[in-house]
A protein has these predicted regions:
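Solvent-exposed, non-transmembrane regions of membrane-associated and secreted proteins
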Residues: 1-149
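C-terminal single-pass membrane-anchor helix
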Residues: 137-172
């Protein structure tokens, strides 16, 4: 679907459809029935991510964002810029802040809180602002290390396994 970039907390993560455990263990999930991450009036995209996984950073540092910070969604060859305008902690069943608001273009990022307890939800909402390409100069062009390691580690394990199997054949 694209990817989200939050330079303040140094993340660049893929956005996948759905919020299954498989999706959330490797990136950010798009909440079903929320607006697709393509922007436009009368839209409200909801993106969810895990916090505190031992194997990945994901949304672990989402609580470090402040009102006025920006995040970017890269989708359909466009860069959508959002300025954080609201940060709230709510109970899991409190969803009023996730509704579409007339004439607004919002994206809300959700993760569990407090860290390690996960009884509430942290909602970080951004309102769409005009993207200025000069803003990109300070932003990372690298994908998070988590994404690199999810490719590198399996390849290394496969290579090691092949070498071991090859050596066992030679010895026999």
């Amino acid at each position: 679907m694209g990817y989200i970039e939050i330079s303040k907390i140094n993340i660049k993560l893929p956005i996948y459809q759905g919020t299954s455990e498989e999706v959330l263990s490797r990136g950010v999930g798009h909440l079903d029935y929320s607006s697709l991450p393509v922007g436009g009036e009368n839209t409200h995209t909801i993106l969810t991510g895990h916090r505190g996984l031992p194997s990945a950073k994901l949304f672990t540092d989402l609580d470090k964002l402040s009102e006025g910070d920006r995040f970017y969604i890269h989708s359909l060859d466009k860069v959508l810029a959002y300025k954080v305008d609201q940060i709230k902690v709510v109970l899991p069943h409190e969803t009023d802040d996730l509704q579409i608001v007339e004439n607004k273009d919002y994206t809300t990022l959700i993760t569990c809180t407090p860290y390690g307890v996960n009884t509430n939800r942290l909602l970080v909402r951004g309102e769409r602002v005009e993207f200025n390409p000069e803003e990109k100069q300070g932003m990372s062009t690298e994908v998070s290390m988590f994404n690199k390691w999810t490719v590198i580690v399996p390849i290394l394990l496969l290579c090691t396994l092949l070498v071991v199997m090859y050596k066992k054949k030679i010895i026999r």
